[in-house]
């Protein structure tokens, strides 16, 4: 008698399928977690030149494998279904620290899928320079290159940096870079943020600056740049932040600056700029912070600055301004801080300042102002030590406020009670502590949408 072979039931087939599927998935994960040998060898060499962990190669033979990833390294699966390094971060916790003998690894520019590099406080003991390998990979995918606070990173910015055509964020701040800014940088049409601040760069700002049509943030502050502000700056229509402070720039602010309609922050302090402001400066309707202390301007204060409705901070100290304080400044309803100290301003203080709801800092000291201080006791108490009118011999205080004010830098009208120092208001409550950290407010409020716009890493810094 022939026995018929029993067919597996549908339920047993389903069980078998569910049993073997995870095995295939695990095999798929193992494949996707592997890295091309040449790329893994490059990564090992980078880690050996940078990391203080000398056992890194043995401890992480496959750094992209699930469960084996290391802080500071991110991997992505490429179109070849293999894993590739997409991000390298060194120097700031929880990322790996750098060893004292670390030197700049030029081989990072040979990683074909690398999108972001961040080296913070890595090169601190031995001099090193930004180097490029002889042979570069075509069509580099690098979008962010940030080298910050590296006191031993010196030398010139290499023109070959212009080969990184996908670069959107270039931050080389707080290093010891020297020489001219290479014009080749301004061929990087994808750049949205360029920060070369706090170096020792010299020479002029290249005219090619105007090629960066997508630029949103530009910071060249704290260098030794000379020459004039290039007129091509007017072509940066998307610019939101401009910081050229603490250089040796001279001449006038170019007329074309009025075309920067998206500008929120402009700092030009500590230069040699002089002459009249552009008449069209009132077109900067998005401007919130204008910092321009310590320039030999020697002109009257521009009335047009009073027509900037979003202006929150205006600093024009120590610049030789003369004439009266424009009445238009009392119409700046969003103004929180105004400093016109150490100029040659004359006339009376406009009375409208006390009606500005957000003002908490007002410095008109060391001028030639005259007349009765036009502020009532409530305004004096509100500003407290954030109000400085000292050094104006022609000013006097209303006698009605004599008993609410102590240690004043302004005489009471008709009396001689000057005791020197700034204006200080008596109050039974504890005096509020002054805070002048205005720029942080700008980055938190004005540049947060900009950070979202970039769509890259949240680590980059304006």
Curated annotation (Swiss-Prot):
<dbReference type="Pfam" id="PF00560">
    <property type="entry name" value="LRR_1"/>
</dbReference>
<feature type="repeat" description="LRR 1">
    <location>
        <begin position="139"/>
        <end position="164"/>
    </location>
</feature>
<feature type="repeat" description="LRR 5">
    <location>
        <begin position="238"/>
        <end position="260"/>
    </location>
</feature>
<feature type="repeat" description="LRR 6">
    <location>
        <begin position="261"/>
        <end position="284"/>
    </location>
</feature>
<dbReference type="InterPro" id="IPR032675">
    <property type="entry name" value="LRR_dom_sf"/>
</dbReference>
<dbReference type="InterPro" id="IPR001611">
    <property type="entry name" value="Leu-rich_rpt"/>
</dbReference>
<feature type="glycosylation site" description="N-linked (GlcNAc...) asparagine">
    <location>
        <position position="139"/>
    </location>
</feature>
<keyword id="KW-0732">Signal</keyword>
<keyword id="KW-0472">Membrane</keyword>
<feature type="signal peptide">
    <location>
        <begin position="1"/>
        <end position="26"/>
    </location>
</feature>
<feature type="transmembrane region" description="Helical">
    <location>
        <begin position="442"/>
        <end position="462"/>
    </location>
</feature>
<feature type="glycosylation site" description="N-linked (GlcNAc...) asparagine">
    <location>
        <position position="363"/>
    </location>
</feature>
<keyword id="KW-0433">Leucine-rich repeat</keyword>
<dbReference type="InterPro" id="IPR003591">
    <property type="entry name" value="Leu-rich_rpt_typical-subtyp"/>
</dbReference>
<protein>
    <recommendedName>
        <fullName>Receptor like protein 29</fullName>
    </recommendedName>
</protein>
<keyword id="KW-1003">Cell membrane</keyword>
<feature type="repeat" description="LRR 9">
    <location>
        <begin position="332"/>
        <end position="355"/>
    </location>
</feature>
<keyword id="KW-0677">Repeat</keyword>
<comment type="similarity">
    <text>Belongs to the RLP family.</text>
</comment>
<dbReference type="GO" id="GO:0005886">
    <property type="term" value="C:plasma membrane"/>
</dbReference>
<feature type="repeat" description="LRR 4">
    <location>
        <begin position="213"/>
        <end position="236"/>
    </location>
</feature>
<feature type="repeat" description="LRR 8">
    <location>
        <begin position="309"/>
        <end position="331"/>
    </location>
</feature>
<keyword id="KW-0675">Receptor</keyword>
<feature type="topological domain" description="Extracellular">
    <location>
        <begin position="27"/>
        <end position="441"/>
    </location>
</feature>
<keyword id="KW-0325">Glycoprotein</keyword>
<dbReference type="InterPro" id="IPR053038">
    <property type="entry name" value="RLP_Defense"/>
</dbReference>
<feature type="repeat" description="LRR 10">
    <location>
        <begin position="357"/>
        <end position="381"/>
    </location>
</feature>
<keyword id="KW-1133">Transmembrane helix</keyword>
<feature type="repeat" description="LRR 3">
    <location>
        <begin position="190"/>
        <end position="212"/>
    </location>
</feature>
<feature type="repeat" description="LRR 2">
    <location>
        <begin position="165"/>
        <end position="188"/>
    </location>
</feature>
<dbReference type="Pfam" id="PF13855">
    <property type="entry name" value="LRR_8"/>
</dbReference>
<feature type="glycosylation site" description="N-linked (GlcNAc...) asparagine">
    <location>
        <position position="416"/>
    </location>
</feature>
<keyword id="KW-0812">Transmembrane</keyword>
<feature type="glycosylation site" description="N-linked (GlcNAc...) asparagine">
    <location>
        <position position="334"/>
    </location>
</feature>
<feature type="repeat" description="LRR 7">
    <location>
        <begin position="286"/>
        <end position="308"/>
    </location>
</feature>
């Amino acid at each position: 008698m022939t026995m018929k072979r029993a067919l597996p039931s549908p339920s047993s087939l389903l069980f078998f399928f569910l049993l073997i599927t995870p095995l295939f998935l695990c095999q798929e994960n193992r494949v996707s977690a592997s890295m091309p040998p040449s790329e893994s060898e490059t990564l090992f060499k980078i880690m050996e030149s940078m990391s203080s962990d000398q056992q890194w190669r043995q401890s992480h033979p496959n750094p992209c494998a699930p469960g084996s990833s290391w802080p500071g390294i991110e991997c992505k699966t490429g179109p070849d279904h293999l894993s590739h390094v997409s991000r390298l971060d060194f120097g700031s916790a929880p990322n790996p620290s750098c060893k004292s003998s670390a030197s700049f690894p030029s081989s990072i520019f040979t990683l074909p899928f690398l999108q972001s590099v961040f080296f913070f406080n890595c090169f601190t003991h031995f001099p090193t320079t930004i180097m490029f390998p002889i042979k570069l990979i075509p069509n580099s995918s690098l979008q962010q290159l940030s080298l910050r606070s590296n006191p031993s990173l010196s030398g010139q910015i290499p023109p070959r940096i212009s080969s990184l055509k996908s670069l959107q964020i270039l931050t080389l701040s707080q290093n010891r870079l020297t020489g001219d800014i290479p014009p080749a940088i301004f061929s990087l049409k994808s750049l949205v943020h360029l920060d070369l601040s706090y170096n020792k760069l010299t020479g002029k700002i290249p005219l090619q600056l105007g090629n960066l049509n997508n630029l949103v943030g530009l910071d060249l502050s704290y260098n030794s740049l000379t020459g004039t502000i290039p007129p091509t700056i007017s072509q940066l229509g998307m610019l939101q932040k401009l910081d050229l402070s603490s250089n040796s720039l001279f001449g006038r602010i170019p007329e074309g600056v009025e075309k920067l309609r998206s500008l929120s922050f402009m700092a030009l302090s500590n230069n040699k700029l002089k002459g009249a402001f552009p008449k069209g400066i009132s077109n900067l309707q998005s401007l919130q912070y204008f910092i321009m202390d310590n320039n030999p301007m020697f002109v009257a204060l521009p009335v047009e600055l009073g027509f900037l409705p979003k202006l929150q901070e205006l600093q024009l100290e120590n610049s030789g301004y003369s004439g009266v304080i424009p009445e238009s400044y009392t119409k700046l309803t969003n103004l929180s801080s105004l400093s016109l100290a150490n100029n040659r301003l004359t006339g009376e203080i406009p009375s409208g300042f006390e009606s500005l709801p957000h003002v908490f800092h007002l410095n008109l000291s060391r001028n030639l102002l005259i007349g009765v201080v036009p502020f009532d006791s409530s305004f004096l108490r509100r500003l407290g030590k954030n109000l400085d009118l000292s050094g104006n011999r022609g000013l006097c205080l209303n006698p009605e406020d004599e008993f609410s004010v102590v240690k004043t830098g302004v005489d009471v009208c008709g009396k001689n009670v000057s005791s020197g120092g700034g204006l200080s208001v008596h109050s039974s409550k504890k005096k509020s502590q002054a805070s002048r950290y205005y720029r942080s407010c700008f980055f938190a409020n004005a540049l947060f949408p900009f950070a979202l716009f970039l769509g890259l890493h949240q680590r980059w810094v304006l």
